[in-house]
Amino acid sequence: MAPNKLAIASVSLSQYPGHILDHKIRAASQAGIAGIEIVYSDLLTYSKTQNISIQAAAQKIHTLCLETNLQVLSLAPFENYEGATTPLKERLALGQHWLEIARLLHAPYLQIPSIYTTDCSRDEKTIISDLQRLSDLASSAKPVVSIAYEPLSWGTNCSTWEGALSIVQRVERANFGLCLDTFHEGTKLWGDNASPSGMQMDAEVKLRDSLRRFVRDCPRDKIFYVQLSDAERFETPYSLAHPWALPGEAKEFTWSKHARPFPLEVEFGAYLPVVDIARAWIVDVGFEGWISMETFDRRMVNGQVTPEMAAKRAVESWRKVQVEIESKSRL
């Protein structure tokens, strides 16, 4: 079995408002999960239920994680930062707040998804400069926080691991690297929720070539952590008439919000080649760092799926992925 430690995003343990962050943390720990990505909105909800500041909430959550032997992996997601039209001074002030919370949580990473708004700068120098300023802010106090940059499949300026790696290399900061997610690789190059087949044209070739280039070109030390999730095949192909569709929203974003089960949960329609991606990203490059489950399953919204149930699903999913990786490696 792979030596990687398993983490999970707090939102992937439940999206029901009545399931509070401390409950999720205990459930993850009891299931044998080693780490957790704290989603800011979950922490904010917890602070309100406790009637305390978000800073005090972060300190309490850190203490709870120590008591339950759970490591905070990251604070996420600091969205739509690089190249945004709002003044950089305001964005850096917000970034400073997020970094303060990350340090109180003792989170080694602040996760930043690639910007996905349309009203943003396309200028490469601006994008790189913005990310350098944030990285420098993150390293200006102790403990240093590292920036985990995640290419979204619907990102405006960056939507592939290759684009993200190029940005990482140009930002050129020790505390700036990659957060890689199988959902984004799978939906950018292989899956298509608007196609009756569920697949893009030349899907297998595009994905295979991408993974080969990844193994050849991606430096292992710039992979900060890897997120795993699958995607559900749409029974009725996506269109603007689909009940989940929103005007102006990318179809991959819609897909992400509603239909991202844990890897290999075929009973929920999971069908992406997650094992192929995970094998390249983890085994073939010798990555031994954190693996985190980041799923968005609409079945978790109404409260019928408890954090305990979700945590068990996550552990079983990771077990299945490891078994499949080993099985394919022997072929």
Model-inferred region functions:
Residues 2, 23-31, 50-74, 93-106, ...:
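Acidic (Asp/Glu)-rich catalytic clusters
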Residues 1-20:
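Boundary/entry segment of secreted carbohydrate-active catalytic domains
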Residues 13-16, 43, 292-309:
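A short, acidic, flexible beta-alpha connecting loop/helix-capping segment that sits on the rim
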Residues 36, 133-268, 325, 329-330:
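Acidic/histidine-rich catalytic cores of soluble enzymes
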Residues 37-65, 114-121:
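Glycine-rich, proline-tolerant flexible connector loops at the mouths of alpha/beta enzymes
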Residues 4-10, 36-38, 72-77, 110-112, ...:
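Hydrophobic faces of well-ordered beta-strands that scaffold small-molecule active sites
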Residues 64-68, 81-180, 187:
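Active-site acidic/histidine proton-transfer and metal-coordination neighborhood
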Residues 302-330:
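C-terminal helical cap(s) of enzyme catalytic domains, especially alpha/beta-barrels
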